[in-house]
Curated annotation (Swiss-Prot):
Record organism: Listeria monocytogenes serovar 1/2a (strain ATCC BAA-679 / EGD-e)
Positions of region (Disordered): 1-50
NCBIfam families: rplO_bact
One of the record's GO cellular component terms: cytosolic large ribosomal subunit
InterPro entries: Ribosomal_uL15 (IPR030878), Ribosomal_uL15/eL18 (IPR021131), Ribosomal_uL15/eL18_sf (IPR036227), Ribosomal_uL15_bac-type (IPR005749), Ribosomal_uL15_CS (IPR001196)
GO BP, sorted A to Z: translation
Protein name: Large ribosomal subunit protein uL15
Length: 146
């Protein structure tokens, strides 16, 4: 076998079906859309969730809950990520954004205990989980709530 003799295996490549190009093709005239009606027209078809005039499911089901306008969403940082920093570094929200660990501070930063920490760091954040606080202090570091 030579490079110029390479061919795709049989049935692995399918030519696209061009519709509306003559009746001999089997897909001419109506282009596989049948005769007239909403689905034969351009842009035709029903909107998402439409059930033919029957009351749709999303309207039959009762409303639930609400959006709390006072909700605070914290950017989450796990312990294993903090190992990137050198020993003795002061980890602040600004530093976390700068290094690309988090995209933005949101309502603050919460440190969670996923993974383990080997470095001695001073971590400044808005919230700490109890296990994360324990782990940072066990590694010889400090936690500071801001």
């Amino acid at each position: 076998m030579k490079l110029h003799e390479l061919k795709p295996s049989e049935g692995s490549r399918k030519e696209r079906n061009r519709v509306g190009r003559g009746t001999g093709s089997g897909n001419g005239k109506t282009s596989g859309r049948g005769h007239k009606g909403q689905k034969a027209r351009s842009g035709g078809g029903v909107r998402l969730g439409f059930e033919g005039g029957q009351l749709p499911l999303f309207r039959r089901i009762p409303k639930r809950g609400f959006t709390n306008i006072n909700r605070k969403e914290f950017a989450i940082v796990n312990l294993d990520v903090l190992n990137r920093f050198e020993d003795g570094t002061e980890v602040t929200p600004e530093l976390l954004v700068e290094t690309g660990i988090i995209r933005n501070e949101k309502s603050g930063i919460k440190i969670l205990s996923n993974g383990n920490i080997e470095k001695k760091l001073t971590v400044k954040a808005n919230k700490f989980s109890a296990a994360a606080k324990e782990a940072i202090e066990a590694a010889g570091g400090k936690t500071e709530v801001i």
